[in-house]
């Protein structure tokens, strides 16, 4: 039993803190389902604990991981113990209703099953963590730069200077996802997704390991506003984006990544024959006869180099396109050198 429980706790480990508020480290077991909610996201997974309780998940996982051998979890005198050999390890608990303000006990079913895991949704969530800004005012969310927007079969986000858009490989409704939820999703997204659905104001994502993950959908009751913001973003991208036609060789990408490592400067100058950052300079064979020159922040360039296959620059920015043509983006604020 202990190994089965430990396997489930390992799934939630990236979400759980060792210290902090009770909602950040405790979970509630009800009828064989473990529920966790920290005020930003919610998660639930079947677990082999045969009684209901509100339990310190970090403490439980730590004890089970360090006990050498098979153990059992018992409820004795309204306390929870991990019993091993002749030793009982007491695990801290709270009253069963202590987390009712941060947990909705949905145990919902996904309305749409995924024959294949939606990879582009995962990829773009990873990219969006560097684009989407934290919400400054909960009462007046700036959907333009404080959410990842999904609409019309695509996903788009911006940091006001750079824009990236992806064509989804799975049909999803109109949504706006905040940075806080994206960060937690990126911590646990390694497993394949097998189902999705909308549950009240949440996007439900079900993974192959049995985990159900709920991300707050800020588009709930805000659909028209989200669509207007989406159209504004995509319209801006259409206006500044130029069809890329220059392929940057892997060797050149490697040199740009290298010069960032040996330089303390955030900005990288880059053209078709060399790259420069601070006092460091690396030369490579010319890869195009077309004008190709710019300077920008490396953190923005890094995303383009990783996902982009084809590129085009002008006096204001750089457009890039993935090999599959499913992801495109634009880096603004390119500086002359």
Locate each region found by the language model.
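Structural preference for solvent-exposed beta-strand-turn elements
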Residues: 1-337
């Amino acid at each position: 039993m202990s190994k089965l429980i430990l396997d489930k706790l390992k799934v939630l480990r990236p979400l759980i803190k060792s210290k902090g508020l009770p909602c950040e480290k405790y979970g509630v077991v009800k009828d064989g389902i473990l529920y966790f909610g920290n005020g930003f996201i919610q998660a639930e997974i079947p677990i082999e604990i045969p009684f209901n309780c509100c339990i310190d998940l970090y403490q439980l996982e730590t004890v089970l991981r360090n006990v050498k051998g098979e153990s059992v979890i018992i409820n004795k005198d309204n306390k929870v113990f991990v019993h091993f050999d002749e030793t009982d390890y007491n695990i801290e608990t709270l009253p069963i209703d202590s987390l009712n303000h941060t947990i909705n006990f949905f145990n919902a079913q996904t309305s749409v099953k995924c024959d294949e895991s939606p990879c582009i949704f995962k990829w773009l969530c990873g990219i969006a963590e560097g684009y989407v800004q934290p919400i400054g005012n909960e009462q007046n969310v700036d959907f333009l730069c404080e959410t990842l927007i999904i609409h019309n079969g695509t996903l788009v986000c911006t940091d006001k200077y750079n824009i990236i858009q992806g064509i989804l490989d799975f049909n999803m409704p109109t949504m706006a996802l905040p940075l806080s939820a994206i960060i937690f999703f990126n911590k646990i997204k390694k497993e394949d997704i097998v189902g999705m659905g909308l549950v009240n104001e949440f996007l439900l994502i079900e993974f192959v390991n049995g985990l159900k993950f709920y991300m707050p959908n800020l588009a709930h009751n805000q659909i028209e506003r989200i669509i207007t913001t989406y159209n504004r973003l995509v319209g801006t991208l259409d206006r500044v984006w130029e069809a890329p036609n220059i392929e940057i060789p892997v060797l050149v990408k490697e040199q740009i990544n290298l010069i960032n490592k040996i330089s303390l400067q955030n900005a990288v100058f880059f053209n078709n024959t060399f790259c420069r950052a601070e006092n460091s300079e690396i030369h490579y064979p010319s890869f195009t006869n077309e004008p190709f020159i710019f300077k920008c922040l490396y953190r923005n360039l890094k995303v383009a180099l990783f996902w982009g296959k084809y590129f085009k620059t002008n006096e204001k920015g750089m457009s890039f396109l993935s090999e599959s043509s499913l992801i495109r983006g634009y880096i603004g604020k390119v500086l002359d050198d």
